[in-house]
Amino acid sequence: MKAFPVICLGFAIFSSSICVNINILQQIGYIKQQVWQLSYYSQSSSSYVVVKLLPNIQPTDNSCEFKSVTQYNKTLSNLLLPIAENINNIASPSPGSRRHKRFAGIAIGIAALGVATAAQVTAAVSLVQAQTNARAIAAMKNSIQATNRAVFEVKEGTQQLAIAVQAIQDHINTIMNTQLNNMSCQILDNQLATSLGLYLTELTTVFQPQLINPALSPISIQALRSLLGSMTPAVVQATLSTSISAAEILSAGLMEGQIVSVLLDEMQMIVKINIPTIVTQSNALVIDFHSISSFINNQESIIQLPDRILEIGNEQWRYPAKNCKLTRHHIFCQYNEAERLSLETKLCLAGNISACVFSPIAGSYMRRFVALDGTIVANCRSLTCLCKSPSYPIYQPDHHAVTTIDLTSCQTLSLDGLDFSIVSLSNITYAENLTISLSQTINTQPIDISTELSKVNASLQNAVKYIKESNHQLQSVSVSSKIGAIIVAALVLSILSIIISLLFCCWAYIATKEIRRINFKTNHINTISSSVDDLIRY
């Protein structure tokens, strides 16, 4: 068993340059899935491909007359005539008409274009520009018409490379011409009719958009493949200086073609192919990861790391690749889409679990397992893992975030009723107990809208209920408060009345006593006065 603990080649302790530790990341539910070689491309040049759709037939000793060729020629003429007329209408506006417009000094028939987008007008401009290469096209036409070779290169004064392809001629050269003198004319005619009929059917199928308007419809991958036939690898290698296979270049759609001319007399089609310039960055890898849920601190969580990263040497970036074209082994981009990663994210990628961030699962539909090179990595605490061969349940300990199931532990695995056959051994040579603090789990996942809305609605209903109860209580408290206020006021008034009465009584008592005292003094004075008067009289 092999172990792949890291992807990059070095480790910088005192810098932010850190390697990706595949082993540790897999143990917390972050699994490497696909690695692409990063290449950049741009549409920088073009080439013309002359396709001869009617093969040359060598003369035979018995001078066979092939009716199939005549019929094929007639059918093909009917097929190509609309394309030729359409191209002529776009490239050559009517002599007496002013209904045309100039783009970069080129006259284009607007009536032939109809309603067109900017990209379609650009394609029409390209088509008209191709007409200026009439001398080169004529040279290619004359060169290919007399030859039986499947690929022929013609260079004119402009030094533009043109590759003449004869897909049917390649079939005629290898099969038909070697048997011309050994078979009867009828047999040869039947075989030739079969080959031509199949090829015509294929052309009719893949060129259907071009029959409508070739200037506004680029040639599809299937059409290019049909035009080039078995010579596709040779054409790609002759026009592109790259070691990338022709299949990947065509599948990525990097080669775009457009019909620029149809020569009905010679049954030839001239296609302009935009040739990209491809540059491969040898030390740049784009890596795809799949995140599955893991069992962290007694709850289902998922790690917060980018799904795709770019690694150049021992540096990592987030790499969305939104405008890139992916094939089996390569990713083609027109520019670098790299985004910086924080130091904590890089440390987490390096296997420093204490720097990783997890978020609890908010919804029920979560990826809980993934296939990895013939093995299964699953969160067996959140789904049922049952081995059927041999038959036993698979238990995931608390200190394991996920479980890796390979051929040594199970041959037929059932995950919540889904059966899988395990065919490989795991390349992980060790597993360690993971310790993750509670502070590393934060809510960063998008919420489950339906669940949260139901909670909000329930909270609102409860709030309305509580508000009604509160209003009722407030009303009760208000009435009670009024009654209490009246009682208090009555008591206060009564007390004040009693106090006032007491004060009045005290004042009356004091006043009465004072009046009596005054009266007593007055009577005493009167008595004295009377006594004095009596003394005076005596």
From Swiss-Prot:
Organism: Mumps virus (strain Kilham) (MuV)
Keywords: Cleavage on pair of basic residues, Coiled coil, Disulfide bond, Fusion of virus membrane with host cell membrane, Fusion of virus membrane with host membrane, Glycoprotein, Host cell membrane, Host membrane, Membrane, Signal, Transmembrane, Transmembrane helix, Viral envelope protein, Viral penetration into host cytoplasm, Virion, Virus entry into host cell
Signal peptide: 1-19
SUPFAM superfamilies linked: Head and neck region of the ectodomain of NDV fusion glycoprotein (SSF69922), Virus ectodomain (SSF58069)
Gene3D superfamilies named among the record's database cross-references: 1.10.287.2480, 6.10.10.110, Head and neck region of the ectodomain of NDV fusion glycoprotein, Newcastle disease virus like domain, YojJ-like
Family statement: Belongs to the paramyxoviruses fusion glycoprotein family.
GO cellular component entries: host cell plasma membrane; membrane; viral envelope; virion membrane
Residues marked Cleavage (site): R102, F103
A Gene Ontology biological process term: symbiont entry into host cell
Record bears the keyword Membrane: yes
Cell compartments where the protein resides: Virion membrane; Host cell membrane
Protein name: Fusion glycoprotein F0
